[in-house]
A protein has these predicted regions:
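Residue-level signature of alpha-solenoid helical repeat scaffolds
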Residues: 65, 150, 170, 206, ...
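Fungal secretory targeting signals
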Residues: 1-24
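Residue-level detector of extended alpha-helical repeat arrays and alpha-solenoid scaffolds
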Residues: 60, 145-148, 165, 201, ...
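Aromatic- and glycine-enriched pocket-lining scaffold segments that form the walls
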Residues: 162-233
Length: 400
């Protein structure tokens, strides 16, 4: 792998070697838009010293996943954008960065506050006193760990760097300490061991199934974990009568009735795709397709554009930096499902949302906001990378 340095020595340049990939003419519009969006994401929000985008920890794992997905689709453009260098810099620097986290929940929406690095001044704040910090992409929240594990799995797929896959394996080892809840095999959200939520369990299943296909010496172990977890998840009641995934389970291990966030409808699709690919069983695709169709029906507006479950995009909070990431997670995983179980509905939904983002949710500098319907709201790193997920997904489906 070829390395040099740019950005004053902060960002390593790494060329990703692979065979030349054909370019689909009709998809080129989305390639050009994704190229502009990735360039803007990295120029405006990336901190090379910490390896993080916009000081947002778990969101940065999603931004990295988006870059990795673009790389698998368009290698030449990825090399022009130095995506391999951003991967390597994030791998080297983010795992050494002191990150301490506070998460609160208000009416079902989680809000994360991060203190990045001890010398930033935030450690003097009372809220952060006594909070734990971890190295190697681990922290107090198992869902955060799951996002990073998936990011390194996708980075491994794109770059072929064994260190990335090894990191995902290491992260999952810590995630396994989340087991032991009162809700059968369900895992806890955090190391406080109080809440069994959907997203952590979806990520747990998805990471296990993904590793089963990539770590041959432990494939049967990971696959057994993933299969048992889906058996539990599908029967736990967390999927409601409308085939939508609620936020989590209550203290009696019953569906808590909280919001059906878009990302909870998305991650499970990716997990079921990985289970299908690992087993060859179409049963998993049937379940995934049912959830995907229910989510589109419930969360799309009259124009077919994805809107968060509580219409938070144009509220005073604009969904917060956590919620701003959600819709991209759904579209990304819908694309994964479409690749193995294609549906005209899925393709048209992805294209329609990518087009609306570019037309209605972009400013003159190619920043992408949270309201995919428009009007444009000042973008953040999370809103921008989330919208990029839709544009990258459009590349994949435009000419299938």
């Amino acid at each position: 792998m070829l390395h040099d340095f740019s950005w004053g020595g902060f960002v390593a340049r790494a060329s990703l070697a692979s065979s030349v990939q054909p370019r689909a003419t009709d998809a080129q519009t989305y390639v050009d838009r994704a190229y502009a969006g990735i360039d803007r994401l990295n120029a405006d929000w990336y901190n090379a010293a910490t390896g993080i985008w916009d000081n947002a920890w778990w969101n940065s794992a999603n931004a990295l996943t988006t870059l990795a997905d673009f790389t698998t689709l368009r290698l030449d453009e990825a090399n022009e954008l130095n995506i391999g260098g951003f991967m390597r810099t994030t791998f080297n620097n983010a795992q050494k960065t002191q990150v301490q986290t506070i998460k609160t929940m208000n009416q079902g929406l989680v809000s994360s506050t991060y203190c990045i690095e001890l010398d930033s001044g935030c450690m003097a704040k009372r809220d952060f006193i006594g909070k734990r910090g971890f190295d190697d992409f681990e922290n107090d929240y198992y869902d955060d760990e799951g996002w990073w594990a998936l990011a390194w799995i996708r980075s491994y797929d794109a770059a072929g760097d064994q260190e990335y896959l090894d990191m995902a394996v290491s992260i999952f080892q810590d995630m396994r300490t989340a087991s032991g809840s009162d809700c059968s095999v369900g895992v806890y959200w955090s190391k406080d061991r109080e809440y069994v939520n959907a997203i952590t369990n979806e990520l747990y299943l998805t990471v296990a199934a993904s590793l089963a296909r990539r770590v041959s010496e432990k494939s049967s172990t990971y696959l057994d974990i993933a299969k048992k977890h889906w058996d539990w998840f599908s029967q736990s009641g967390i999927i409601n009568d409308d085939d939508l995934v609620n936020d989590g389970l209550d203290s009696k291990c019953k569906n808590n009735g909280l919001q059906t966030w878009s990302y909870n409808q998305g991650v499970i699709l990716g997990g079921l795709v990985e289970l299908h690919l690992a087993t060859g069983d179409n049963f998993y695709l049937v379940s995934a397709t049912k959830i995907a169709k229910a989510a589109i029906k419930a969360l799309a507006n009259d124009d077919g554009i994805l809107v968060e479950t509580d219409d938070c995009e144009l509220s005073d909070t604009h969904c917060g930096t956590d919620g701003q990431q959600f819709k991209g997670v759904f579209i990304r995983n819908l694309r994964y499902l479409h690749e193995v179980a294609p549906q005209d509905l899925f393709k048209s939904f992805i294209i329609k949302n990518a087009d609306s983002i570019w037309k209605n949710d972009r400013n003159k500098n190619d920043r992408l906001g949270v309201a995919w319907t428009g009007p444009y709201v000042d973008a953040t790193g999370p809103s921008h990378s989330s919208a990029l997920d839709a544009i990258v997904a459009a590349i994949a489906v435009a000419d299938d």
